[in-house]
Amino acid sequence: METVQLRNPPRRQLKKLDEDSLTKQPEEVFDVLEKLGEGSYGSVYKAIHKETGQIVAIKQVPVESDLQEIIKEISIMQQCDSPHVVKYYGSYFKNTDLWIVMEYCGAGSVSDIIRLRNKTLTEDEIATILQSTLKGLEYLHFMRKIHRDIKAGNILLNTEGHAKLADFGVAGQLTDTMAKRNTVIGTPFWMAPEVIQEIGYNCVADIWSLGITAIEMAEGKPPYADIHPMRAIFMIPTNPPPTFRKPELWSDNFTDFVRQCLVKSPDQRATATQLLQHPFVKSAKGVSILRDLINEAMDVKLKRQEAQQREVDQDDEENSEEDELDSGTMVRAVGDEMGTVRVASTMSDGANTMIEHDDTLPSQLGTMVINADDEEEEGTMKRRDETMQPAKPSFLEYFEQKEKENQINSFGKSVPGPLKNSSDWKVPQDGDYEFLKSWTVEDLQKRLLALDPMMEQEIEEIRQKYQSKRQPILDAIEAKKRRQQNF
């Protein structure tokens, strides 16, 4: 008798959460696996959809965040249906959090891959990524949407090598009544000149950012990354368009592609549709050429996670041993105090007590953080606070955030006498800096660090003075245009 083997029917692919799933608690529909990182306005987790077995990404957003911006992001994602844009599946309210369920891209962002491998991309790899990215931008721009934050950190790759646009926390919708925007939103080094100048911009602002991203993928960082961001804000609109540090290393086609992206006049800048016909993009190879670098990056990430887990396990063991030592009331002393007993202390060395430890634990025990990097500011996703004060340009908030981080990092450090008040030190009129020779290296380094806030203040004063002169001219031009239209 012939036996018939029964095969399990294949699970359907998740396209959108149905009404039944959306009425349940999210834990009934998904199993959360691990934290991936921080996104705009919230944390991002890897999860599995129980019914289909499909892996998804879930952004958990505290409701005290700017709900208007969150709703805008969801609205934009809901309207998009492209293989080159991260898909949106549905949303839940859970306690004080909003859960946004999105497509999962297992390879992470392009910037993550560059960091993990400690290696920049080849022209072939860049061309393949740019081709998919341009298709995503062509789709968005056709839908009258501006991404406004194109960079390697917001281009995600799935494990097959397909690139998708992500992080719509600052994306905008162009309407018939407002053909251009005049708000400064985005990441400073990638911003187009017209965005910085606040003279209004449209979809081709994303093309400038794409050109900067192409340089970032080739060289590991965007132009001006080595200088203070506030200086970059002034240099981008006034300097000629940036290019490669060593142009001779790159082909004519690649150099020309970047040149067409980085045209300062928006009216003369190429569109996404035009750039898809550029020889550099048209000759791009298939996504299979990205699989080696993806596998290499994922191997590095796995090894780092395993190393972090080993550190946690080791710390747990040390903690356990310390607990055993501290469990008794009395501990035998060592050294000169042989034969005496004293109470064991569990306080740290810096606790200003008269009792010393038998064993000193590290001041900060290692904690495992999934997918954490040292360079958080360039990570795949990050929380943006620019909507907290709508009247303030976002790049200024970027600098303020940096200043807060610097203050936190330097908290508690004593400042040498000559550096306590930066205003006490004046630049010598005669240019005689001999007195600096008597300062220690530490004093000199702290003096150097103190110059940055002074420079930011001076630059801001210059910016305000420049704006006060520039605005009346712009107002006069606008008034003349209106009068001409009336005639």
UniProtKB/Swiss-Prot annotation:
The modification Phosphoserine is found at S265, S320, S410, S414. Inhibited by the C-terminal non-catalytic region. Activated by caspase-cleavage. Full activation also requires homodimerization and autophosphorylation of Thr-183. Activated by RASSF1 which acts by preventing its dephosphorylation. Residues 30-281 form the Protein kinase domain. The modification N-acetylmethionine is found at M1. SMART domains: S_TKc (SM00220). Gene3D superfamilies: 1.10.287.4270, p53-like tetramerisation domain, Transferase(Phosphotransferase) domain 1. The keyword Nucleotide-binding applies. One of its GO terms (molecular function) is protein serine/threonine kinase activity. GO terms for cellular component: cytoplasm; cytosol; nuclear body; nucleus; protein-containing complex. Its EC number is 2.7.11.1. Residues 290-310 form a coiled coil. The modification Phosphothreonine is found at T3, T183, T340, T367, T387. It is found in: Cytoplasm; Nucleus. The record marks D326, S327, D349, G350 as: Cleavage. Autophosphorylated on serine and threonine residues. Phosphorylation at Thr-387 by PKB/AKT1, leads to inhibition of its: kinase activity, nuclear translocation and autophosphorylation at Thr-183. It also diminishes its cleavage by caspases and its ability to phosphorylate FOXO3. Proteolytically cleaved by caspase-3 during apoptosis at Asp-326 and Asp-349 resulting in a 37 kDa or a 39 kDa subunit respectively. The 39 kDa subunit is further cleaved into the 37 kDa form. Proteolytic cleavage results in kinase activation and nuclear translocation of the truncated form (MST1/N). It is less likely that cleavage at Asp-349 is a prerequisite for activation as this site is not conserved in the murine ortholog. Its main location: cytoplasm. Residues 305-337 are annotated as: Disordered. Stress-activated, pro-apoptotic kinase which, following caspase-cleavage, enters the nucleus and induces chromatin condensation followed by internucleosomal DNA fragmentation. Key component of the Hippo signaling pathway which plays a pivotal role in organ size control and tumor suppression by restricting proliferation and promoting apoptosis. This is Serine/threonine-protein kinase 4. It comes from Otolemur garnettii (Small-eared galago).
